[in-house]
Amino acid sequence: MALDSAKKAEIVAKFAKKPGDTGSTEVQVALLTARIAELTEHLKIYKKDFSSRLGLLKLVGQRKRLLSYLKRKDYNSYSKLITELNLRDK
């Protein structure tokens, strides 16, 4: 369940700190959130797709680690990001 290039470019443009920024923590979290949303919709239809479920859990764990890092390093950016992505603060 990969994102198409147009949607990916839109997300990168929205969350990038500067033009061409594809590796910042904010961009990575936003891309992971979009992939998680797509996989969640897929799993609502195909409930027995366990390999996709494991992939989803891996993505959720990766996003959790990145959010934890961002919360430690730049709390203002973290709080702005979770409000934009409608994520819960732990």
UniProtKB/Swiss-Prot annotation:
HAMAP family: Ribosomal_uS15_B (MF_01343_B). SMART domains: Ribosomal_S15. One of its GO terms (biological process) is translation. Belongs to the universal ribosomal protein uS15 family. The gene is rpsO. Part of the 30S ribosomal subunit. Forms a bridge to the 50S subunit in the 70S ribosome, contacting the 23S rRNA. One of its GO terms (molecular function) is rRNA binding. It comes from Campylobacter jejuni subsp. jejuni serotype O:2 (strain ATCC 700819 / NCTC 11168). InterPro entries: Ribosomal_uS15, Ribosomal_uS15_bac-type, uS15_NS1_RNA-bd_sf. This is Small ribosomal subunit protein uS15. The lineage of its organism: Bacteria, Pseudomonadati, Campylobacterota, Epsilonproteobacteria, Campylobacterales. The keyword Ribosomal protein applies. Pfam families: Ribosomal_S15. GO terms for cellular component: cytosolic small ribosomal subunit. Keywords: Ribonucleoprotein, Ribosomal protein, RNA-binding, rRNA-binding.
